[in-house]
Amino acid sequence: MAEYGKDYEVIVVGAGHAGCEAALASARMGCNTLLLNLHLDAVAQMSCNPAIGGLAKGHLVREIDALGGEMARVIDATGIQFRTLNTKKGPAVRATRAQADRRAYQFHMKQVVENQPALDLKQGSVSRLILQGDKVSGVETTDGLRFFGQTVVLTTGTFMRGLIHVGLQHFPGGRAGEPPSLGLSDHLAELGLRVGRLKTGTPARLDGNTIDYDRLVPQHGDVPPKPFSADTEKITSPQVPCFITATNAHTHDIIRQGLDRSPLYQGVIEGVGPRYCPSIEDKIMRFPDKDSHHVFLEPEGLGTREVYPNGVSTSLPPDVQLAFLRTIPGLEHVEIMRPGYAIEYDFVDPIQLKPSLETKKIRNLFLAGQINGTSGYEEAAAQGLMAGINAVHALRDCPPVVLGRDQAYIGVMIDDLVTCGTSEPYRMFTSRAEYRLLLREDNADQRLTPLGHQVGLVSDERWQRFTRKMDKIVEGRDFLEKRRLSSSDKEAIGRLGLEDLKNGLSLVQILRRPDINIEDLVFCDDRLADIPENVREQLQIEIKYEGYIARQYEMVERFRRSEQIAIPSDMDYSPIEGLSIEVREKLQKVRPQNLGQAARIPGVTPAAVAILSVLLRRN
């Protein structure tokens, strides 16, 4: 083994979405950082769909941005369609989704990484960790190099013992055309970490020149497109439509006939697949009464003919893929440019992590992304950002940054992982959050930018813009409370459909009415037009939903009280009377840090929590 002549403070293994955020956070916080990837042409690669955001995922992207992460800025620079989803529903579940130019996104993120001071990007495959006692001190690569670092972040994606399946053929790979990472997961298991097996998949890529777009329904983006990042003034990339079609009974018949050559249905694949992003084979078999499934045709970029058919992920043989695709309207003469495939890979049971994403067994070793059992670029990037921040805090002996369930979707996700673990690829949903009315996209900066500035990831310039926005919210609320309409404002009363106002009403009182929005009030007083649109939107939400918001804050206060009751890390649960054997085993396995976390462990009953509460308060 040859030692590399330079020591690092933070080493990040894997330059996908988690690894890029972890390495950038570490370097921007002033630490000498190394980012290693199997292949430098695959930095920030979008392995599956060419899109960022979506339901709950858009919230994660806004939170990453509010903390000072990079993903939002890169998609704003390279996005080719932006849409707000759930516009007819409440503000808690509205979300932004952007189609990406896949190559442009990858190239842009790599440029950001390469231009970041204190960050070295190198090619290499890590096979082992270097340990000093119970503490990590570096990594070894398959080509015989040893890199030393005070903290290590593993963000290996789907590469650990990756195995690709196309029909009944299978071969090692971490992604199509790229080798897997061999040796590392076996090494982690040797060190005592529990390693499991998961599966995911991707559809074929289609030749756009062989698609009959006249038979498809176009789906256009918002005009004007709304950026993800607070740093982006406006989207400047050309915008393009997606197209919608659907499978039919003939499609489903061909798929059923091909199941004897499906690795999924012939017992070849052992890993558990994603429940909420099933393959088209799974959809047909799990929902036999459904005679059609939507297919969204998404362009892979402005400079390519490749099209991503969202909704038909598959590992069937290429000839079956082509046959079923050609039964779909608009795809009768389609050609496949790359076949779809399934991939199995190793992951580490996230119950073995602290809320900081540091492993409980090995000090200064952090895990983020799909290695923790999650799926999705956004989930990975969010974990990478937090792991990067906490890796720096660990080597500086600072307390870890742990976001609460009431503070961020990132906090909900990490708490779910380290408290409950996962046996299938974990995906973020708004329904996973108890306090989702407090965790909206529009107030992500309000919730997290102060923390981002505190840890050193939000610039002073951006902090000043944020404080100016907060001042405008206060001023806007004050104006709406003081400005009143009276019976003399006959034109305004008539246009708003109000009855004669004897005692007058403030604009806040009027805005609380369900049929009136803040734009309706602009003609009442043109000073409202001077308030920025994003501030007006936030004022409207906070005023219209303030009763519900107040109730959620009351719930949060009760929740926080239980979170403040700490549980010693070395607590022995075996002698505690009243706890069942099952509860003791679960508490011993998870080792919750506080009473609130203990209460969220599946199988830990309210009675058991009450016993723990009495014991902890007594001691």
Curated annotation (Swiss-Prot):
What is this protein's record name? tRNA uridine 5-carboxymethylaminomethyl modification enzyme MnmG
Q: Which PANTHER family match?
A: GLUCOSE INHIBITED DIVISION PROTEIN A (PTHR11806), PROTEIN MTO1 HOMOLOG, MITOCHONDRIAL (PTHR11806:SF0)
Provide the protein's localization: Cytoplasm
What organism does this protein naturally occur in?
Syntrophotalea carbinolica (strain DSM 2380 / NBRC 103641 / GraBd1)
Q: Which chain positions lie within coiled-coil regions?
A: none
Organism lineage: Bacteria, Pseudomonadati, Thermodesulfobacteriota, Desulfuromonadia, Desulfuromonadales
Q: How does it assemble?
A: Homodimer. Heterotetramer of two MnmE and two MnmG subunits.
Q: What does this protein do?
A: NAD-binding protein involved in the addition of a carboxymethylaminomethyl (cmnm) group at the wobble position (U34) of certain tRNAs, forming tRNA-cmnm(5)s(2)U34.
Please give the PROSITE patterns that the UniProt record associates with this protein: GIDA_1, GIDA_2
| NCBIfam families membership | mnmG_gidA
